[in-house]
């Protein structure tokens, strides 16, 4: 069996959970002896065997970003000839999978749903008119796909809600995973101090991109209520738009007028530095208003951190309230934005959960150890590779 994986992100160019998923899934599948996996990704040429990078087309340099994406996708299609299955990840690569399958090669197209355009209307802020194009690409590809892999039960429900014409039997759940050998507690006090954090003082830490869905503005407001000795550490980069970047910067400046120990690392750090920063923290916080699963929570749990996270999307399938962390309740406006119905209440509940986490170190450590056990036992990439292979075989009738 030959499977061609189509993705915007692939090492070394990874900036989100979808990229982590693709990299780890490819590694798990290539470890098997009964299949060949070829990767087609955006960007520069890769040295990795059976992996092809596809740069932006210079002829489309002045075009809308979504049109540029379509150009790269079309460049990918030619390389899929001879594949038994094409498997695309995110709308950025869905067009390539759809063209290869439905219009050219005839092989089955499988899509992994990491996020959905109808559930992220704020992307119009980033893509402009291209949001209508990305939404059309996603809808067209999903409705024609042989199977859709949802990364959580919550995502499966969202797929069927967003695209009700899809046969529910075609939508399978295969969770994201974690490499618990790589993601583990590894003290690095020099690294931590080098970023301006005192490893001997309590801290709450956020890791993620600066996007609407990650809920950073709510977190920055909630952190006003933390005890003064608690540091606030934000490993937050890759802003979607100048607008969200400016909003976060303004809230950060305001928070710094009320307390010391607010540390913002605006670039995406190497994994070894992230694990050192996680190891030094007291609790991890994920204030997302939209999160299909949240690999970042698994990464924190694997590093033995208790997690304070919003009870939305697939997060409750990872974080067990009262066992591995605290789930913060949220009632959301049903317009696709994930906006809290009562933002002040959400901020207050988030602050209360964070205060619980930092006020009882023994309980926090207990939750962290339980989180590590859960990550190891339930979310290994080997098992996720096996379950993905089952989906491949089902569409091939093997």
Model features per residue range: what roles?
Residues 107-108, 118-140, 157:
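Nucleotide-sugar donor phosphate/pyrophosphate-binding loop at the beta->alpha transition
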Residues 201, 245-268, 272:
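Nucleotide-activated donor-binding/catalytic signature segment of Leloir-type glycosyltransferases, i.e.
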Residues 20, 202, 206-225, 246:
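A conserved mid-protein helix/loop that constitutes part of the nucleotide-sugar donor-binding site
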Residues 45, 178, 231-249, 263:
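Glycosyltransferase donor-sugar binding loop
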């Amino acid at each position: 069996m030959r499977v061609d994986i189509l993705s915007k992100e692939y090492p070394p160019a990874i900036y989100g959970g979808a990229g982590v998923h693709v990299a780890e899934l490819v590694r798990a599948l290539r470890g098997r002896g009964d299949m060949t996996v070829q990767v087609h990704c955006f960007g520069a040429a890769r040295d990795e065997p059976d992996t092809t990078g596809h740069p932006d087309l210079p002829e489309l340099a002045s075009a809308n970003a979504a049109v540029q994406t379509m150009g790269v996708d079309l460049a990918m299609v030619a390389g899929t000839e001879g594949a038994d299955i094409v498997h695309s990840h995110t709308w950025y690569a869905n067009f390539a999978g759809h063209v290869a399958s439905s219009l050219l090669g005839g092989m089955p197209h499988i899509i992994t749903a990491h996020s959905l355009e109808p559930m992220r209307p704020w992307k119009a802020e980033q893509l402009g008119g291209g949001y209508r194009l990305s939404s059309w690409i996603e809808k067209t590809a999903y409705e024609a796909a042989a199977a859709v892999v949802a990364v959580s039960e919550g995502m499966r429900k969202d797929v069927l809600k967003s695209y009700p014409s899809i046969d529910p039997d075609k939508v399978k759940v295969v969770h994201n995973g974690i490499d618990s050998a790589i993601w583990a507690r590894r003290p690095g006090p020099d690294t931590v101090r080098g970023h301006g954090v005192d490893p001997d003082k309590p801290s709450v830490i956020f890791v993620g991109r600066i996007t609407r869905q990650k809920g950073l503005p709510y977190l920055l407001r909630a952190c006003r209520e933390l005890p003064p000795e608690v540091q606030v550490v934000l490993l937050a980069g890759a802003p979607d738009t100048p607008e969200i970047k400016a909003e976060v910067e303004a809230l950060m400046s305001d928070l710094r007028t009320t307390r010391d120990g607010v540390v913002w690392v605006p670039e995406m750090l190497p994994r070894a530095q992230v694990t050192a920063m996680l190891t030094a923290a007291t609790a991890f916080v994920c204030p997302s208003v939209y999160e299909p699963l949240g690999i970042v929570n698994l990464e924190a749990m694997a590093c033995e951190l208790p997690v304070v996270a919003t009870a939305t999307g697939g997060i409750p399938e990872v974080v067990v309230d009262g066992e591995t962390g605290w789930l913060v309740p949220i009632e959301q406006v049903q317009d696709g934005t994930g906006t809290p119905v009562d933002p002040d209440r959400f901020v207050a509940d988030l602050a209360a959960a964070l205060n619980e986490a930092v006020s009882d170190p023994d309980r926090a450590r207990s939750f962290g150890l339980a989180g590590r056990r859960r990550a190891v036992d339930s979310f290994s990439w080997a098992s996720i590779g096996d379950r993905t292979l089952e989906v491949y075989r089902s569409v091939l009738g093997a």
